[in-house]
Curated annotation (Swiss-Prot):
The gene is rplX. Keywords: Ribonucleoprotein, Ribosomal protein, RNA-binding, rRNA-binding. Part of the 50S ribosomal subunit. It comes from Treponema pallidum (strain Nichols). The keyword rRNA-binding applies. PANTHER family: MITOCHONDRIAL RIBOSOMAL PROTEIN L24. Belongs to the universal ribosomal protein uL24 family. GO terms for biological process: translation. This is Large ribosomal subunit protein uL24. The keyword rRNA-binding applies. HAMAP family: Ribosomal_uL24_B. SMART domains: KOW.
């Protein structure tokens, strides 16, 4: 904790470790305090939902569970890459370490 999190919401990422290794998805949410991300459709867990009223149905839902940021890599145009920063027109922008393109 305390490091800069280089992954942002809506980034395409590749899972590099764990049961979903090799799969890709978009980041739904970044949990900075615990260094984890929620990736759409990956690391699914079953969650029990209580019935709240007579019409409302309870049951078992599948929801995304957080993945540690060390287990994902941002996808550039040519594949997974590390992220660097560069100043362009007085603004700090994220760049692909492999190709130098702006992310």
């Amino acid at each position: 904790m305390g490091k800069t999190v280089k992954i942002r919401k809506d980034d395409m990422v590749l899972v590099i470790a764990g049961k979903d290794r090799g799969k890709r998805g978009a980041v739904l949410r970044v949990l900075r305090d615990v260094d984890r991300v929620l990736v759409q459709g990956l690391n699914m867990r079953k969650k029990t939902i209580r019935r709240k009223s007579a019409q409302d149905e309870g049951g078992i839902m599948e929801v995304e569970a957080p993945i540690h940021i060390s287990n994902v890599m941002i996808m550039g145009k040519k594949g997974p890459t590390r992220v660097g920063y560069r100043m362009e027109n007085g603004k700090k922008v994220r760049v692909c370490r492999k190709t130098g393109e702006v992310l």
